[in-house]
């Protein structure tokens, strides 16, 4: 079975491949957007992660005829009333400028004391089939925000985010950008949402 992942982010494809391998699901070939003929990029104008994930997955399925998986994710900061939320990737104005997004967020919460620097990464993953079936799952990852970026393994807001699981271990305060890929898979918001979709993928693959 071919499964289009509506992204060109190699780290996202790698994460899903590792999760499928761990679940023992075989005969699923993951394709990135670069592997299929280009089609008009859908406008992500949803007001929720779920709406945006479905917009991307529906566009992939309708334009390519392939079962399509898409995710929409972001960071919800308690002190900012849940923002940047669905605007996370373009918080500083330009889509995908991690440095600018991190700098702006740090400036906005500079005066927030440690006990109020809570945040959560949220990911909604959606699968849409060409015949219109839809599967949607959400994952959340709670933690706190640092005052400066630490680590080089992740992307987005990873260098600012200390997972709750790390905070509970005395002497450990690693950011999610300091975790190994395997550690992040086990804990992350996207990992949780993707694992919740494994039964649907297995069903679609006839396993």
Swiss-Prot record:
Nucleotide-binding listed as a keyword: yes
UniProt remark on cofactor binding: Binds 1 Mg(2+) ion per subunit.
Cellular component GO terms held in the UniProt record: cytosol
Keywords, in A-Z order: Hydrolase, Magnesium, Metal-binding, Nucleotide metabolism, Nucleotide-binding
MF terms (GO), sorted A to Z: dITP diphosphatase activity; ITP diphosphatase activity; metal ion binding; nucleotide binding; ribonucleoside triphosphate phosphatase activity; XTP diphosphatase activity
Binding site for substrate: 7-12, 73, 155-158, 184, 189-190
Domain of life assignment: Bacteria
Classification via InterPro entries: dITP/XTP_pyrophosphatase, ITPase-like_fam, RdgB/HAM1
Enzyme Commission number(s): 3.6.1.66
Keyword set includes Nucleotide-binding: yes
Record-level GO BP terms: nucleotide metabolic process; purine nucleoside triphosphate catabolic process
Required cofactor names: Mg(2+)
The reaction(s) this protein catalyses: XTP + H2O = XMP + diphosphate + H(+); dITP + H2O = dIMP + diphosphate + H(+); ITP + H2O = IMP + diphosphate + H(+)
PANTHER family: INOSINE TRIPHOSPHATE PYROPHOSPHATASE, INOSINE TRIPHOSPHATE PYROPHOSPHATASE/HAM1 PROTEIN
Quaternary context: Homodimer.
Descriptive protein name: dITP/XTP pyrophosphatase
Organism per entry: Corynebacterium efficiens (strain DSM 44549 / YS-314 / AJ 12310 / JCM 11189 / NBRC 100395)
